Amino acid sequence: MSDELAVQQVLAHYVRAHDRRDGAAMGALFTPEARVTIFYNHNPDGQPELIGELAGREAIAQATTHLMKPHPPRGWSHNATDGLLIDIDGDRATVDAQFMVFTILGDAKPASGWPAGARGAMGTITPIESGYYTQKLVRVNGQWLIESLQVRHNLPFAF
């Protein structure tokens, strides 16, 4: 597998661990001392606003499992990435990607069955987040791991 494809695979595994809220899978993608910084990208003063930071593989794994909002029954999220810009220099790489997160909620099937004429997917898909991921990766024993991740959201956050 080429280095470019290998670092793309790290991003693909990242978004899947995010969608599943799988802390173990998420943690396995990061170096032990990795950092995640999360910003609101469009603050009125033009400067990104820091809204969160995680330090260390274990903290990142724990946050994925315990701090991300769980999916409701019949619910899911889909973290779609696009527009990847990849730079590889030896055992270091940078991946800059656009993202959009959708929340998916399937309708409950009525006890009497779907109404006459109902066809296709039953439920809603709503965009809830958008922004950019910048991953700095390092190759360790032949495996690409995330050393730092910057998440820049295009929408403000309330906690």
Q: Where are the predicted features?
A:
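Short, surface-exposed alpha-helical recognition segments that flank or form part
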Residues: 2-5, 55, 121-125
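A solvent-exposed, acidic/Ser-Thr-rich amphipathic alpha-helical stretch
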Residues: 23-99, 105
